Amino acid sequence: MAKELRFGDDARQQMLAGVNALADRVKATMGPSGRNVVLERSFGAPTVTKDGVSVAKEIEFENRFKNMGAQMVKEVAAKTSDTAGDGTTTATVLARSIVVEGHKAVAAGMNPMDLKRGIDKAVTAITKELQKMSKPCKDGKAIAQVGTISANSDQAIGSIIAEAMEKVGKEGVITVEDGNGLENELSVVEGMQFDRGYISPYFINNQQNMSAELEHPFILLVDKKIATIRDMLSVLEAVAKSGRPLLIVAEDVEGEALATLVVNNMRGIVKVCAVKAPGFGDRRKAMLQDIAILTNGQVISEEIGTSLETASLESLGTAKRIVVTKENTTIIDGEGKATEINARIAQIRAQMEETSSDYDREKLQERVAKLAGGVAVIKVGAATEIEMKEKKARVEDALHATRAAVEEGIVAGGGVALIRAQKVLDGLKGDNADQDMGINILRRAIESPLRQIVANAGYESSVIVNKVAEHKDNFGFNAATGQYGDMVEMGILDPTKVTRTALQNAASVRSLMLTTECMVADLPKKDEGMAGAGDMGGMGGMGGMGGMGMM
């Protein structure tokens, strides 16, 4: 396919146009006075959002060279979202500022590689200073404040996230779901819950809740399908004699085995419920082992030389209570040994450190939380579907921000932390004048988040930036109220991880753009077939269809 080429300054100008066009649309969402952006959907209601990365992902330009510049900044926003979960608009605004200032320097004849080295030195110095300024985020009040700011100053969201973290711990799993009412709701699932329900509705013993509830049950864990009742006859007889109920967790229970269990349950011979094991493949085996450790049981597996025929009551796990619904199984107060559970948690955490997959890390984190004791579910309430989507996105952003705050601490929000970190650049020198220019580019760029927050609130950015820079510590400007003061006391906080990640990712794209000398894109295809489709002469005979009788 034929290609179109652009070189030198022409290429950089096209790329810069894409960066500016994307950033202009994203920057409008920044700060407490940021505006919403409405995104069209191919079906259903449009999406209303203030999330920078959501806006960026929707933007495509017809001009392919312009689009390349926009795509690079999209990557900055997406990487920031993946790493820190928030700060995507900040990253976009910083990236644009660095690229624009860097482009001016390259146009003036400066060496792009030396500019890059100068910017890198400045980013390293600022990052270290941010980490020095960072304060631990330990108490519920600070967590609520971080969540409130990230959720566009919605105190209800900040408070419910802080409450959820308090109940399940800072490493607990917190999920966000659509609610049924107008108010946000928080429910906490005690013990271990996995997303598998009863195999047959005939196991239900609580008709009001449509659930199977087992008090002090035995738990049989099997890593294969159970098709014949003969395999598990000895276990069933032993459980029936004990008079206690039985939960069976297996790859599947089918055919004769399922029919026999249902009949025994309905006749009251043995109170039983069967569910499929959670997960797939190796993850299923790992989760079965988690349940075994939590309930002080053993997984019946041919891989380790155990079989159903030889299983006894000693092989079974136990728990205080189990509730099985159509979709979930919850094991409450498993009778596993604390030392074994803690050892299993440590083992899973070690796997989290080693894995490079975000998906695997998330699944491992869920397993830790389930073993450690609890999952919190935030149900988002809203009047309409459009409001629900927008509110749910804000809750998820706030949740990511609070996790980041717990992980690396907090700094003064509203762009103030970057202004305070600016002082470390005063004594920083490059190896030559071009590197010094790179340091100065970053010095100006890190003012851009505060400038944008102030501009979106309708104030004069230069005056406010100068006044904030003249003061010390946490002194800043509250764009929501139009007042100056201590940002920490006013509850305006940013997670250190979010600010650091936004800066590092924004700076990473500038070297690619500043050192670009050639751009290559496919030539647009001509619509060759459209001209011949005009008369569609062969369709004339369709008129004869009028004589066809209706059936």
From Swiss-Prot:
Molecular function via GO: ATP binding; ATP-dependent protein folding chaperone; isomerase activity; unfolded protein binding
GO CC field: cytoplasm
Domain of life: Bacteria
Keywords in alphabetical order: ATP-binding, Chaperone, Cytoplasm, Isomerase, Nucleotide-binding
Disulfide bonds: none
Keyword Metal-binding: no
GO terms of biological process kind: protein refolding
Catalytic activity: ATP + H2O + a folded polypeptide = ADP + phosphate + an unfolded polypeptide
InterPro entries registered for this protein in UniProt: Chaperonin_Cpn60_CS, Cpn60/GroEL, Cpn60/GroEL/TCP-1, GroEL-like_apical_dom_sf, GROEL-like_equatorial_sf, TCP-1-like_intermed_sf
Annotated ATP binding sites: 29-32, 50, 86-90, 414, 478-480, 494
EC number(s) stated in the UniProt entry for this protein: 5.6.1.7
Location(s), subcellular: Cytoplasm
Pfam family, one: Cpn60_TCP1
Region forming the signal peptide: none
Family to which this protein belongs: Belongs to the chaperonin (HSP60) family.
Entry function: Together with its co-chaperonin GroES, plays an essential role in assisting protein folding. The GroEL-GroES system forms a nano-cage that allows encapsulation of the non-native substrate proteins and provides a physical environment optimized to promote and accelerate protein folding.
Protein name: Chaperonin GroEL
Organism expressing this protein natively: Legionella jeonii
